[in-house]
Amino acid sequence: MAPNGSNTNRLPDPTGAFATTHWSVVLNAGGEDSSQALVAIEKLARAYWYPLYAYVRRKGHDTHTAEDLTQEFFARVISRNFFARVDRTKGRFRSWLLGAMNHFLAHEWEKARAQKRGGGATLIPLDEAQANERYERQLAVDSAPEKVFDQQWALTLLERAATRLRAAYIADGRPEVYDCLKAFISGGSAPPSYGEAAVQLGLTESAVKSAVHRLRQRFHELVREEVAQTVCTPTDLDDELRYLLTVIRS
């Protein structure tokens, strides 16, 4: 049986209420300094720096400049006066982040270059070599910057959900089940036949089909949880899921 795992962030909850998310904590700070909001925005930044880096690269900046831009942008985001500038009408972190970066590129970057980047601190751990390799591997040559951003955002969500899912199988003592069946959710290489998986795992084909069903179901739940952390309302969640699905399929 696939592991259940913890589900502390599942949204909405059975009562119909929409639970607190990282982004709602930031918006609800209401322009005031909040240690809880700082932690929340830093978690979001650490999770989603790469789509922004890819966007900056696609805007024409080289690897080193894109890293500098991304670091300096987040140095300003994770700052004590950040919350006073958050527009509460921006219901989705993805939309807000792209708009904030465009403003930074247009109005703040030249000023930032005259100062020491991020006060000399690396706030978000960026692996420049890994980021560049990923960018070169995944980027479609004719993609517009905004399309690159949304594509990489969607891929990051899927990767985070898959990482959490594998961790749950490891915790349950069955990593081999995930490793054998992951192609059924990855959309990459062709998955094995049920018969092949049954032989590899020592199960019946019927048991493999059930395991794949549970794997897909839990993966979809985790994707929903990841998206939920970047929005504030059930409507935003459903709209964002639909939009990202079109991005993945495009």
Q: What are these language model-derived features?
A:
Residues 1-250:
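Intrinsic, short, N-terminal disordered tails of RNA polymerase sigma-factor systems
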